[in-house]
């Protein structure tokens, strides 16, 4: 298990999380990093990419096609209001929204395992 502190870049936690989740849930879950941001076109106009408040990592889980969203923060990091709103929207639509600030096992692996078992019971 990796140890993270406030100086650990979110990108390091994201990469570790994606590797761990991909190995543990190899046949049940596909996840990917969301790239958001902004750039300027040739005329100098700003073009924004992504959805406001969108989580850092998205995915889809078998057997029901459950939407997965994972917001990653450094230890002690706080969500912005639009991130909380996005998370609530995902939950309201039956998806899974998780916040991870470094404890990948407790904050991501365990909740995904529980949801996978629940979803499997639904189709039995």
Where in the sequence are the language-model features?
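Catalytic phosphate/metal-binding cores of nucleic-acid and nucleotide-processing enzymes, i.e., regions
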Residues: 1-124
């Amino acid at each position: 298990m990796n140890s993270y502190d406030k100086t650990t870049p979110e990108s390091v936690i994201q990469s570790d999380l994606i590797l761990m989740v991909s190995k543990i849930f190899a046949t049940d879950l596909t996840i990917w990093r969301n790239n958001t941001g902004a750039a300027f076109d040739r005329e100098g106009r700003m073009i924004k990419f992504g959805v406001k408040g969108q989580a850092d990592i998205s995915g889809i889980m078998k057997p029901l096609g459950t939407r997965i969203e994972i917001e990653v923060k450094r230890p002690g990091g706080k969500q912005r209001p639009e991130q909380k709103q996005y998370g609530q929207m995902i939950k309201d639509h039956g998806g899974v929204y998780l916040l991870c600030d470094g404890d990948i096992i407790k904050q991501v692996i365990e909740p995904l395992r529980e949801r996978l078992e629940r979803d499997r019971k639904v189709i039995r």
